[in-house]
């Protein structure tokens, strides 16, 4: 049950408000940079409008800033950098890159002192029963390094919270392919409901879990589920109301936007897939050699993962078959574990989750539970927190969000037609609601950039974005279209030259290619090529700002939890290595009914 140690102290609401006040003061000047759409970089003279410095000096200053130490303790006050030194008071243009970078670094989650160390929290939750995840759980056996890192770190924390609060039931919202859910049930013997809006994900998770259970004992015969006998103690099936699995129709799947690999809203943002801080690159070659989802700015939860099982677990090689046949011990382990797990303790369900969802309609045998989410997309993360605060059965929550660009904003003009009492993704807390604060889609999109993976000064792959920005100029000048509603998509990777890129793009957009000759197209390219460094420098400014936008979103969620009377403890925890998993912060909260030591 509960650990003897009290949970770590966390910042109170007045302290968080002070942090927010300083952050908002900085963002009022800096938000214009994050909000600028790089597709319009040349058509709207973005560099000239927002930056009063040559691009070479900006890039040089950011390179130097990247290797500087963290802000000194004496500089950590809210007024350590006067804003007029960063931005011009009259034109609002950026004047000092050094001050800009230093202030942005100061207002990151980590440097503001908002995080509760994960080791400290685990020690408090587990007390004298501290047990790390078995070292024999090798990443290669299940998934790629990134996903394995996330699942193992989060599952240990979830199990510790469940033990601390005396909970056996876990609800995994936005469960996707079921990696976390399967691990929680098989490794820790927890009763897990994995809820996703996509029938495809649900059926895939069921099949994957079925195969995994058959082979689990062969690879991990000493899991907690076997050791404590939980699986065999629960002969009953998980109860699911009839028809729940069929709720994930095409409309709800599209509304949820979960697992959609075709999102085109990120056109015009740089592809940073080949970048990482130079020092980290040497240490993390095995990580960066994999496809990087989040810094590509496509769906952060639409991971390109290998199957959950080892490659040879489904189709063993001949030598492995012989070894298995010769090993009576392995056969016995496999048969014993198979009998113990005849009743599944992981049930994938299909349902579209909102803040107003009635859990009893989805889970028939709902009991006191812990609600979790690993990289829950857009509004699903704030909805998870609202369900936690409003449903008596949900005693604790552990949520890692992603896809900030898909959040709905209450004070964004484009949403005027929505109901006033609707649950918005941002803001959640009273402080930001009173400020009527709005980030805007482009700023939220820039918050998805991964600063830790970007090598300052190492040469960003900005050519694709440069192509798109110059194309926009051609479209404006020759077709009279100042705002193109259609998206070009991933044409750049299919083209060998700017000329081919323009031709393919115009065709996709349904524009008459004959209006622009080859000579005209190449003239545009040659005229703007010397200004490509402006685009590179501007993108780096956006990357440096990205953690500040994320800090604002996370602070909003933490403040919301602090405002709730029924919440006894809440915190931000840096759960993952940001190089492996840029969306690394978990929002955690426990209700007063939990024993807090």
Swiss-Prot record:
GO terms for biological process: methylation. SUPFAM superfamilies: S-adenosyl-L-methionine-dependent methyltransferases (SSF53335). GO terms for molecular function: methyltransferase activity. Gene3D superfamilies: Vaccinia Virus protein VP39. Keywords: Methyltransferase, Transferase. Residues 317-326 have a biased composition (Polar residues). Residues 245-254 have a biased composition (Basic and acidic residues). The keyword Hydrolase does not apply. Its EC number is 2.1.1.-. Residues 245-265, 317-342 are annotated as: Disordered. Signal peptide: none annotated. It is an enzyme of class 2 (transferase). InterPro entries: Methyltranfer_dom, METTL25, SAM-dependent_MTases_sf. Probable methyltransferase. This is Probable methyltransferase-like protein 25. It comes from Mus musculus (Mouse).
